[in-house]
UniProtKB/Swiss-Prot annotation:
Annotated protein name in UniProt: Ribosome-recycling factor
Annotated compartments: Cytoplasm
SUPFAM superfamilies: Ribosome recycling factor, RRF
Naturally occurring in which organism (per UniProt): Geobacillus thermodenitrificans (strain NG80-2)
Lineage of origin: Bacteria, Bacillati, Bacillota, Bacilli, Bacillales
GO MF terms, alphabetically ordered: ribosomal large subunit binding
Main location per the UniProt record: cytoplasm
Name of the encoding gene: frr
Role: Responsible for the release of ribosomes from messenger RNA at the termination of protein biosynthesis. May increase the efficiency of translation by recycling ribosomes from one round of translation to another.
Keyword Metal-binding tagged: no
Pfam families: RRF
GO cellular component entries: cytoplasm
Gene Ontology BP terms: translational termination
Amino acid sequence: MAKQVIQQAKEKMDKAVQAFSRELATVRAGRANAGLLEKVTVDYYGVATPINQLATISVPEARMLVIQPYDKSVIKEMEKAILASDLGVTPSNDGSVIRLVIPPLTEERRRELAKLVKKYSEEAKVAVRNIRRDANDELKKLEKNSEITEDELRSYTDEVQKLTDSHIAKIDAITKEKEKEVMEV
């Protein structure tokens, strides 16, 4: 039972790190990537639909995204959604595709993005620590119900702590890499 608690904690921590990585993919780092538009939703016949479900997004150049909608009638809505999304890019529409030219980041914008990366990093670390707390609570219940001994409890909580430390180290490494990418001119 205790091994199962630790295994579940590991899986949850892995998911938290993956979610953090996905979150960072939406942070613009001066280069074009389709992940920038992941959170942009378009009002498509009354339903908020992610833009990547309504169009093909390609990266023909390092600083350009091309959005080719499957349905040309939503091109204006897509343009509005991109403008409203606070990505800091202005779409240009030629009737059949939308082009997004990603401007080089200003020093100020780089610092803002670095702060955002730190914020996401902190949220991910808190999520991992909450998982640790839940796992430790679960292990304490097992000890209270005499399913494991006090020594086993100590051993298992140490194992959970090692898991936590390794996942936080992963988050720190990912954060450092993304900050470097954001601050790169």
